[in-house]
Amino acid sequence: MSMVYANIFLAFIMSLMGLLMYRSHLMSSLLCLEGMMLSLFVMMTVTILSNHFTLASMAPIVLLVFAACEAALGLSLLVMVSNTYGTDYVQNLNLLQC
């Protein structure tokens, strides 16, 4: 495994550990999820470019679209929770159930 792959994998693991450790606030969880998606995007792009997979060249773009949709939904949920309760604690999400 080259150093590029090791660094990208380390970035993914650090984002995952951040998501597991700092899950009390919604904003920190969203930032960790974005870090995970960014490292996955870079890993897919580097792998596809280094192995010359021409048929899979659209996969990183699709992943980036899903990451943008996830970020938009997460930010709208963050705005809704912060307007309703005044804080961005994840424990407030259980109160949103009907």
Swiss-Prot record:
InterPro entries: NADH_UbQ_OxRdtase_chain4L/K, NUOK/Mnh_C1-like
Subcellular location per the Swiss-Prot or TrEMBL entry: Mitochondrion inner membrane
Keywords: Electron transport, Membrane, Mitochondrion, Mitochondrion inner membrane, NAD, Respiratory chain, Translocase, Transmembrane, Transmembrane helix, Transport, Ubiquinone
Any matching Pfam family: Oxidored_q2
Main location: mitochondrion
A GO-annotated cellular component: respiratory chain complex I
EC class of the enzyme, as a word: translocase
GO process terms (BP): ATP synthesis coupled electron transport
Keyword NAD annotated: yes
TM helices/strands, residue ranges: 1-21, 29-49, 61-81
Similarity remark: Belongs to the complex I subunit 4L family.
Job description of the protein: Core subunit of the mitochondrial membrane respiratory chain NADH dehydrogenase (Complex I) which catalyzes electron transfer from NADH through the respiratory chain, using ubiquinone as an electron acceptor. Part of the enzyme membrane arm which is embedded in the lipid bilayer and involved in proton translocation.
Subunit relationships: Core subunit of respiratory chain NADH dehydrogenase (Complex I) which is composed of 45 different subunits.
Protein name (Swiss-Prot/TrEMBL): NADH-ubiquinone oxidoreductase chain 4L
Organism of origin: Cystophora cristata
